[in-house]
Amino acid sequence: MKSVIIQGLFCGFLAIGLWASMLLLFLHLEQEDMLENEKEELLKKRSLGKNAHQQTRHSEDVTHDEVNFSDPELIQGLRRYGLNAIMSRRLGIEREVPDSRDKICQQKHYPFNLPTASIIICFYNEEFNTLLRAVSSVVNLSPQHLLEEIILVDDMSEFDDLKDKLDYYLEIFRGKVKLIRNKKREGLIRSKMIGASRASGDILVFLDSHCEVNRVWLEPLLHAIAKDHKMVVCPIIDVINELTLDYMAAPIVRGAFDWNLNLRWDNVFAYELDGPEGPSTPIRSPAMTGGIFAINRHYFNELGQYDNGMDICGGENVELSLRIWMCGGQLFILPCSRVGYNSKALSQHRRANQSALSRNLLRVVHVWLDEYKGNFFLQRPSLTYVSCGNISERVELRKRLGCKSFQWYLDNIFPELEPFNTERKRKKNRF
């Protein structure tokens, strides 16, 4: 009797196990079918060989409802991604944005034979649709013969939809996108260097993972560098609102910074645009944002890439800006190239990087500011005795490149940056 009961229990457990296995298999196959159907539907909408200069409209009309700030899902998305994830899902992986270029820019034509571009996009825990919109906009709005590749560098993202699901969706782009997954957290700066090391295009174009390019965005960048391989160029950075995700045109500005080494945008005066090129005139810029710019691949390597001793992100934009100008290059903003950017002001990731940012800025100060470093410490006295690590390699790089002094940079590139109390200011006050 006892053996019969045991046999019955064994058979029962076996049946339950088989049933559970079949259920899991069914759910897995159902999920695969759903993803396959979604992918097939998206493939029907896309043809990489057609309409290279036109962006495909999303199939559904998106209505921008009033933002409900009490919605727990909205708050969760802001905390998790730094943007309105509800609206992002509603927009999907591609959309049409307004052409924010001046009419003069819209009438410009560029040579067919330009250098090829490798687009490098690094991401960490990015919202899925936001990342795919960045990729889709590049594919849809870039001439295919100039687009060598898009290199995505995943810096050990933790979100599930950035793993197998992302791999699956990237098949839509038919091999145009290469995905690199870091084996450990490297931070944005080193991730960019990893992406650049795998690039094969003539020009490296760095983009953030939460941006969307506009019409004829790539050609002006490539054309400028084709004329001077030591010219580094940036687009005008339009605004994507983190709550509504509306795309808004930005005015023509130049990059600058203060003695905290914080990037700021300075207005360009109307008389500077009075020449024959009008509002399409390239703008000489003392500094640039770190996330969106184009540079000749060989020149990037010759110039020393990024400072490998910097962590995560922050400060690398000022460091590279100084190195470009002081070591024989030029930095310009091109009004005819437009890229929208979501600043994600509420992002937890940005708030968590203050320690790394301070260390990065100290490396800039001790390598590049010469006798003017005291102006930084007047603003940030708490960092006076903080270590910035070993900078001997970067000091040697500056010597090897034959770079000019920071005094030269202030006199010739950025005279608007007034020192607080230095010999330069005392000399100026004598006259």
Swiss-Prot record:
Q: List the disulfide bonds.
A: C105-C336, C327-C403
Could you tell me which Gene3D superfamilies the record lists for this protein?
A: Spore Coat Polysaccharide Biosynthesis Protein SpsA, Chain A (3.90.550.10)
Question: Which stretches does the entry tag as region Catalytic subdomain B?
Answer: 282-344
Grouped into one coarse class, the protein's main location is membrane
Question: What residues form the membrane-spanning segments?
Answer: 5-27
**Where are the residues of the annotated region Catalytic subdomain A?**
114-224
Keywords on record = Differentiation, Disulfide bond, Endosome, Glycoprotein, Manganese, Membrane, Metal-binding, Signal-anchor, Spermatogenesis, Transmembrane, Transmembrane helix
Reported consequences of knocking out the gene: Heterozygous mice show male infertility because of immotile sperm: glycolytic enzymes required for sperm motility are decreased, their protein loading into acrosomes disrupted, and aberrant localization of the ubiquitin-proteasome system is observed. Females show normal fertility.
Annotated tissue distribution: Expressed in testis. Mainly expressed in the round and elongated spermatids during spermiogenesis, not in the outermost cells of the seminiferous tubules, which contain spermatogonia and somatic Sertoli cells. Present in the juxtanuclear space in the round spermatids, not in the acrosomal vesicles. In the elongating spermatids, localizes strongly in the acroplaxome, the region between the developing acrosome and nucleus. During differentiation, also weakly detected in the transient manchette containing microtubules.
List the GO cellular component terms: late endosome membrane
List the Cytoplasmic topological domains: 1-4
Chain positions carrying an annotated carbohydrate: N68, N353, N390
Q: Which residues form a coiled coil?
A: none
SUPFAM superfamilies xref list: Nucleotide-diphospho-sugar transferases (SSF53448)
Q: How does it sit in the membrane?
A: Single-pass type II membrane protein
Name any one GO molecular function: metal ion binding
**Gene Ontology annotations of biological process type:** spermatid development
Cofactor(s) annotated in UniProt: Mn(2+)
Q: Which residues lie on this side of the membrane: Lumenal?
A: 28-431
Q: What does this protein do?
A: Probable inactive glycosyltransferase required during spermatid development. May participate in protein loading into the acrosomes and accumulation of ubiquitin-proteasome systems around the head-tail coupling apparatus region.
Its family remark reads:
Belongs to the glycosyltransferase 2 family. GalNAc-T subfamily.
Domain remarks in the entry?
There are two conserved domains in the glycosyltransferase region: the N-terminal domain (domain A, also called GT1 motif), which is probably involved in manganese coordination and substrate binding and the C-terminal domain (domain B, also called Gal/GalNAc-T motif), which is probably involved in catalytic reaction and UDP-Gal binding.
User: What is the official name of this protein in its record?
Assistant: Inactive polypeptide N-acetylgalactosaminyltransferase-like protein 5
The source organism is: Mus musculus
